[in-house]
UniProtKB/Swiss-Prot annotation:
Magnesium in keyword set: no
Keywords: Amino-acid biosynthesis, Lyase, Metal-binding, Methionine biosynthesis, Zinc
Catalysis performed (reactions): 5-(methylsulfanyl)-D-ribulose 1-phosphate = 5-methylsulfanyl-2,3-dioxopentyl phosphate + H2O
Protein name (database record): Methylthioribulose-1-phosphate dehydratase
Gene that encodes it: mtnB
């Protein structure tokens, strides 16, 4: 797909995310890799359900510099980190859904284990419900550079797959193209809802 087609696909995904209620009150941020040096990131404070092409800002991946001087998402550094770590990644989606936010708080360990669900196969490379998928959880931090450093240290020891959670904050997930990132988001959100319901029922 061309750059313009990918951007249109990302806009469509953003509007769909808005309809799902996964980025309330202008929360969340989305991005698209352009090349090895640049990406597009959503401007700060924009409602994700009504984004237009002008709401994406050009960002230099190595430095987070924005040539236009406008203000990108405060969490731009996490998007650019993912692009630097994994050259194959083409799009990153960050959402604030209720299920992701709550699960990231009730799970006390540093990873959410998903196992036994057929929908694990919505995640690239997963072929069976018998495997375990671990979604790392990082404690929230308003200092994004410090949070990015912790994510980078984890990724150096254990490569990230599909996404990670920030505790009490939300989900970051990605894909090689927008379509794959969107599928991973939808699959993970389904799995989060299943896992949350399972825990609630088992607690009764």
């Amino acid at each position: 797909m061309t750059e313009n087609q990918q951007l249109k696909a990302l806009l469509s995904a953003c509007h769909w995310i808005g309809e799902k209620g996964w980025c309330p009150a202008t929360g969340g941020n989305m991005s698209l890799r352009l090349d090895d040096q640049h990406c597009l990131v959503t401007e700060s404070g924009k409602d994700k359900g009504s984004l237009t092409e002008t709401d994406f800002l050009l960002v230099e991946t190595a430095s987070n510099h924005v040539p236009s001087g406008r203000t990108p998402s405060a969490e731009t550094g996490l998007h650019t980190l993912i692009y630097r770590l994994y050259p194959q990644i083409g799009a990153v989606l960050h959402t604030h859904s209720v299920n992701a936010t709550v699960l990231s708080r009730v799970e006390r360990s540093d990873g959410l284990v998903l196992q036994g669900y057929e929908m694990q196969k919505s995640l690239g490379g997963q072929t069976t419900h018998l495997d375990s998928v671990v979604i790392p959880i990082f404690d929230n931090d308003q200092d994004i550079s410090r949070l990015a450093a912790r994510v980078a240290a984890h990724a150096e020891a254990t490569p990230l797959q599909y996404g990670f959670l920030v505790r009490g904050h939300g989900l970051y997930c990605w894909g090689r193209q927008v379509a794959e990132a969107r599928r991973h988001l939808e699959g993970l959100e389904f799995l989060f809802q299943c896992e949350l319901q399972r825990r609630l029922l088992e607690a009764k």
